[in-house]
From Swiss-Prot:
Membership in a protein family: Belongs to the YqgF nuclease family.
EC number annotated for this UniProt entry: 3.1.-.-
Annotated function: Could be a nuclease involved in processing of the 5'-end of pre-16S rRNA.
Main location class: cytoplasm
Keyword line: Cytoplasm, Hydrolase, Nuclease, Ribosome biogenesis
Name of the protein: Putative pre-16S rRNA nuclease
Hydrolase is among the record's keywords: yes
NCBIfam families (alphabetical): RNAse_H_YqgF
GO molecular function: nuclease activity
Amino acid sequence: MKVSADTPGHDDPGPGRRLGLDVGTVRIGVAASDRDAKLAMPVETVPRETGFKGPDLADIDRLVAIVEEYNAVEVIVGLPTDLQGNGSASVKHAKEIAFRVRRRLTNAGKNIPVRLGDERLTTVVATQALRASGVSEKAGRKVIDQAAAVEILQTWLDARTRALEPQSTDTQDFDEKGNFPG
């Protein structure tokens, strides 16, 4: 099934920190941006507890607390898709966590957007980077979740920056006759 992520820069909340979440069935990797929304950094790995039914558990409590601790203006939840844009089985998990975090923030009177960001290949990239630095996949699973969250968030931040840049008309490179000077 085709799934689509949200568009970075669309309905942008402006300057401020963003959080990125890599939702798995066992753990949720968390990353945060700097205040300028240029650089993503790992924060922590939250054990996954909340399922599809029942109340929010400690994982949702912790994620909402991190949003508040970092004064985040936007939360990006990785949407797991393949290279063709088809959703994997993990899409339901990502959407469930996004829904629960959004609901809790809204119920607390906080108008913080929770968006779904493209997650293609983020865990692969994170695993390769950690392996290259000498960390085994088994030893670094918690770190891999954080690194994947960093990849999700950094991809969003880069796309946001491009989307918000003023579009150049390139006319400044030409003289008044339309010729390139020099």
